[in-house]
């Protein structure tokens, strides 16, 4: 599975780019927002979401982890696939989506082609709790740290994958950052694992 590509933008089309990585060209689909920021001939790092199907392998690229997270989050809504998720992200930033859902602003989604009343209702209903759960804890921790909320959420997810419960990961991260607000992401993970092992 490909998680990241660093290379030069070789060419660009309406919904994808070809990124040259050491002489190999990868076709990467992206949102209109991301495509608008990419310039042919320049080097970029793209975070990649790989979709493997029987008939194809598709790569989806993002300049930020937050956009990648929202790409996956949107697809958790019944009726939203990769194309619709990219369409939404071509019109709205992750911040726009968070604010709209928190404020119950349905009109912002209805303005997007292909998003009708029923899909808008599902987006509001199915994502409201998920967004609150994912971002509330990291936003609270962010207030006392130089690490972004998205990075904190990635650390929490990494710790969960390493055996922590989500509650345990959140509390551990918050405790470490409170003691050292300038800690790096790598050190944050190492310290969390060290503290957990020493408690057994």
Curated annotation (Swiss-Prot):
One MF term in GO for this entry? ATP binding
Q: Which InterPro entries match?
A: DNA_helicase_Holl-junc_RuvA_I, NA-bd_OB-fold, RuvA, RuvA_2-like, RuvA_C, RuvA_C_sf
Residue segments, region Domain III:
147-200
Can you state the subunit structure given in the record? Answer: Homotetramer. Forms an RuvA(8)-RuvB(12)-Holliday junction (HJ) complex. HJ DNA is sandwiched between 2 RuvA tetramers; dsDNA enters through RuvA and exits via RuvB. An RuvB hexamer assembles on each DNA strand where it exits the tetramer. Each RuvB hexamer is contacted by two RuvA subunits (via domain III) on 2 adjacent RuvB subunits; this complex drives branch migration. In the full resolvosome a probable DNA-RuvA(4)-RuvB(12)-RuvC(2) complex forms which resolves the HJ.
Looking up NCBIfam families in the UniProt record yields: ruvA
Function as written in the Swiss-Prot or TrEMBL entry:
The RuvA-RuvB-RuvC complex processes Holliday junction (HJ) DNA during genetic recombination and DNA repair, while the RuvA-RuvB complex plays an important role in the rescue of blocked DNA replication forks via replication fork reversal (RFR). RuvA specifically binds to HJ cruciform DNA, conferring on it an open structure. The RuvB hexamer acts as an ATP-dependent pump, pulling dsDNA into and through the RuvAB complex. HJ branch migration allows RuvC to scan DNA until it finds its consensus sequence, where it cleaves and resolves the cruciform DNA.
**How does the entry describe the domains?**
Has three domains with a flexible linker between the domains II and III and assumes an 'L' shape. Domain III is highly mobile and contacts RuvB.
Q: What is this protein called?
A: Holliday junction branch migration complex subunit RuvA
The top of its lineage is: Bacteria, Pseudomonadati, Pseudomonadota, Alphaproteobacteria, Rickettsiales
Quick one: which gene encodes this?
ruvA
């Amino acid at each position: 599975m490909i998680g990241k590509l660093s290379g030069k933008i070789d060419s660009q089309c309406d919904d994808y780019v070809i990124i040259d990585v050491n002489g190999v060209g990868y076709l990467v689909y992206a949102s209109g927002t991301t495509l608008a920021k990419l310039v042919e001939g320049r080097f970029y790092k793209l975070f990649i979401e790989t979709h493997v199907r029987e008939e194809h392998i598709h790569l989806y690229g993002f300049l930020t982890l937050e956009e990648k997270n929202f790409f996956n989050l949107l697809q958790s809504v019944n009726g939203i696939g990769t194309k619709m998720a990219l369409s939404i992200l071509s019109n709205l930033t992750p911040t726009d989506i968070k604010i709209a859902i928190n404020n119950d602003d349905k009109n912002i989604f209805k303005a997007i082609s292909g998003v009708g009343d029923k899909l808008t209702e599902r987006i509001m209903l199915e994502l409201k709790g998920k967004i609150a759960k994912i971002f509330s804890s990291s936003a609270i921790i962010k207030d006392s740290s130089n690490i972004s909320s998205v990075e904190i959420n990635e650390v929490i997810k990494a710790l969960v994958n390493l055996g922590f419960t989500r509650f345990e990961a959140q509390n551990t991260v918050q405790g470490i950052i409170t003691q050292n607000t300038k800690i790096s992401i790598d050190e944050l993970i190492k310290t969390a694992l060290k503290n957990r092992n020493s408690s057994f």
